[in-house]
Amino acid sequence: MKIGYIYAIENNLNDEVYIGSTLRTIEERFSEHKASARRRPTCTFHKFMSLHGIEHFKIIELKKIEVNSFFELQALEESYIRDYGSLNTINGVNKAAVHTRNEILVKRKIYSKECVKLPPLDEVIKIATKASLKKLEINEFIDLFIGEENKWNKMFDSDLSGIHISSLILNQLGYEGEFKNQQTCFKRFLKRNNIIIQEFSSSNPELKLYPSIQEEMKNMKTNVIANRKWLIANPRDLKKIIMKLNTKNGDAIREYYICMDELVQFYSQYSLSYDSNNN
């Protein structure tokens, strides 16, 4: 199990609030937000921070919880965003632009992230050199260019051998509509591409290992639970799914992995540059 946090970022200018989640400490996550606001703000919240000055913002812990994966944490985060996150963008809809929870749910669209875009190598080295006087570790280097909210590899980050393909994950993969429609389209995709994943029935004792499934079952009637099947994919199969994914988010996820590979190569160049200038 991992320790996760739901947090809020407030400011002393107005009542607007940003809700987020992290598997790091909230202090580390806040440092990332501030760095993104200073560097190259792209999302609504980081532009807001940059416009008004990061010195006007503070972070507070809302909830500490044990989870098996980052996606279980995101499922909880989403409920907090709907109720409190006036500076969040929910599935393509800026919550500050709507007024009631019902409006948010009605206007809810497919969850979509932009493709990660890296600056040229010389600019990458310049940014990394300015970021710290000491030599950055590779994870610190990557964090400068890919924020936690854009790390698609968290999809595979689980303490269990399998990953519950929940509505949230299907949203992340780019499947639209209600859960039943999402699951139907996803199963067709699996069959078409000869990818076989597990289906757990309610009698499977392993269900109790998945908090996200247990949470779903709380809101189901007994007869619905008895007939329900839960999809479980191991990390290797999920990677195969990503490679063949033809939804709106497919290219963005694959582009992320290309950028990760480029950053590993860029880090080697940064290391050579740092060592050359500090010896």
Swiss-Prot record:
Q: Which residues form a coiled coil?
A: none
List residues of the GIY-YIG domain: 2-90
Which SUPFAM superfamilies does the record match to this protein? Answer: GIY-YIG endonuclease
Q: Which CDD domains match?
A: GIY-YIG_HE_Tlr8p_PBC-V_like
Family note: Belongs to the IIV-6 019R family.
The identity of this protein, by name, is: Uncharacterized protein 019R
